[in-house]
Amino acid sequence: MKKLLLSAALTAFGLLATPALAQQVNAYCSTNQTWCEMAASEFTKATGIKVVQTHLGTGEALARLKAEAANPKTDLWWGGTGDPFLAAAEEKLLDAYRPAYTKDLYDWSVRQYDMSGNFVGAFYTSFIGMGWNEETLGKKKLAAPKCWADLTDPKYKGEIEMAHPGSSGGAYTIVAGLIQLMGEDAAFEYMKKLHKNITSYTKSSQAQAKNVARGEAGIGISFLFGFEEERQAGFKSVRATAPCEGTAYELGGIALIKGARNGELAKKYYDWLMSPVGQGIGAKANSLQNPANKTFKQDAKIPTMDGVKLINYDFKKYGASAERKRILEKWEKEVNSLPR
């Protein structure tokens, strides 16, 4: 019966394997690497279409798409925070695509299509939090942070890690979120103080949860689901919370690339990723974002968003290429250039 149901679901999305010459779709994936790999493997098993996929942070993927604009090397980009996707749409690097099954998606996902002119879909959502290792902080007699304001306390000097907003879409979400929460001037003053306590800015926002779990960082600022993933993987001293003042969130992006060589195959991979089968891969890969497709029961391991104080994040403004560039340049000049 399960095989029949799976077959029916794939048929509805036009995804059953059919005899063909060697078919290949090229993709950039910016979410959890295990999820990227599992999705590609399962899609190939289901359809017979080979996936050649490169794992890149969203900032890196955007830079590569710009460099390859005259001769695109990939067909599809999926996963990772949506702001860089919106910047790519603005720079005419993407092809518009509005799936026929938007009725199966949550409203926040459909709004991403509407806002972007159908150039960017919302694959999942998740929110920014702070995670810590109780054991690591306990050895140093440090209390766990609960609010953004706590993180600038000098007692946390050398204890906090986050990603670099130039290479990580998640870190850019943090910076843009602080600006919207506090106002730009106050946010930059805050980030200057926070900078003094940062031990390192990593390339990807996926590093913080792992480094906190392994005691390599006492506190990490990233998407909260990552810390929950580590806790469920056996690192029971990992804890996390959403900042008490309010926090930003992401809409994970998915988009077709303008000028793609394998556009029709890319649509098949896209549709499969948005189907219940494809969306369910995330939790199987222990990647616990909230999926966009509402037609199936999401895994109980996925953190609830109940009680989290979310800001009214302006995706259109902060996803704009010029605004993103301005903020990143200002952050480099006024924050990252300071000594720690």
Per-region residue spans from a language model:
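Periplasmic-binding protein-like
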Residues: 190-195, 201-202, 234-258, 294
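A ligand-binding cleft/hinge motif common to bilobed small-molecule-binding domains
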Residues: 83-87, 213, 217-237, 286
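Extracytoplasmic ligand-binding site segments that recognize negatively charged/polar headgroups
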Residues: 30, 34-37, 73-209, 213-216
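Conserved C-terminal helix/tail region of periplasmic/extracytoplasmic solute-binding proteins
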Residues: 313-340
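Sec/Tat signal peptide C-region and signal peptidase I cleavage site
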Residues: 16-22
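Early extracytoplasmic/lumenal segment of secretory-pathway proteins
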Residues: 23-87
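Mature extracytoplasmic/periplasmic domains
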Residues: 252, 257-315
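Bacterial N-terminal signal peptides that target proteins for export
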Residues: 1-8
